[in-house]
Amino acid sequence: MSTTQKDITIFESTSSTAPLILLNTVQNEGEQVYNSVVSMTDVDFSMAAIGNLAWNREMTPWPAPAVMRGGEDFAGKADGYLKELTGTILPDILAKISAKPEYMALAGYSLGGLFAVYALYRTDLFDRAVSASGSFWYPDFLDFVKEHRFCRKPARLYFSLGNKEAKTKNPVMKTVEERTRELYRWYQ
């Protein structure tokens, strides 16, 4: 399925109330993620993997300079992408699946994990969020979280972080573990 220049792959459950997970993908790894999760759980769910994203533009909440030498600046267009996601992409997905999801969750890795949490402050459509190695080092994100409220308190938040992320020499990115822990404490 292709909508608004995004590539969308739907993995549909046969259950009429299976939750729907929306996964923003870095490199169209949706099928790999879906198969991995299916192999680890008996929980029935549908998943829509969304690819062909302008990662540094659409996953970032506000403009910020690049953190890698020679890297692309962050454009801060998350609100625009969220409008596209909730106004066009999600309705198209819901029209294509037969289930009426029990709940919907937003998931992502890296900047996609940052976006998953940020989106909870901008829309009440999602009941849960998954942030795998979320880019919580992003400038001013902790301040944003502390100064704003969720549109709808999520039933669940899941954070994970690998062993290597905080060991980078990059002074901005190396704060990711400390900031992830701080967010965890804030949400308790």
Segments (PLM) and residue ranges:
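The feature captures the conserved acid-bearing segment of alpha/beta-hydrolase catalytic domains
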Residues: 136-188
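Short beta-strand immediately N-terminal to the catalytic nucleophile in serine-hydrolase-like folds
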Residues: 103-108, 132
